Amino acid sequence: MEVLLLLLTLSFSAVVISSNNSIPVHFWLFTINNLEEYEDMVFDGSSVTLSPDTLYDVTKPTKVVVHGWGGETHIDEIFALAYAEAGLDYNIIGVDWRNMEGPAQEQVVEVGVYTAHFLKALIEDYNLLLEDVHPIGWSYGAHVVGRLDLI
């Protein structure tokens, strides 16, 4: 049973990795300067588009925060407020995958790989340094974070 599950996971991952299609996952940017309203970081599956007046600052540490199953708790906002209250000026990127459909086991793989492609695009297009990225997952979001290495 464990081998079968591993094979199913690997085969599903391979399908996602080869796809550059957009899926219903959104990336929200919070900084110390926009705690009330996030900035949308648009990702089409291969490239990231930032607003011309973006608050994203590649020179600051980046926290990638992934909510749990269903996304009822806005954990990204909670982290953004906590870091701001501590006087820490970070890029907080919330990964919103609440609109995904299907079994959670498949979703965490797909969202993890998609998020990895998003980060790869930030690295290639905006010179993000991987060592400045700290992924944080809450509940099922931890499983998403665990899939960031699949590309």
Residue spans of the language-model regions?
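Flexible, membrane-associating and regulatory peripheral segments of lipid-active enzymes
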Residues: 1-94, 98-108, 116-130
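Extended hydrophobic secondary-structure segments that form protein cores and membrane-embedded regions
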Residues: 9, 133-138
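Glycine-rich nucleophile elbow surrounding the catalytic serine of serine-hydrolase chemistry
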Residues: 67, 136-147
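Hydrophobic alpha-helical cores of multi-pass transmembrane domains in eukaryotic membrane proteins
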Residues: 112-115, 137-139
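Conserved hydrolase catalytic core segment
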Residues: 151
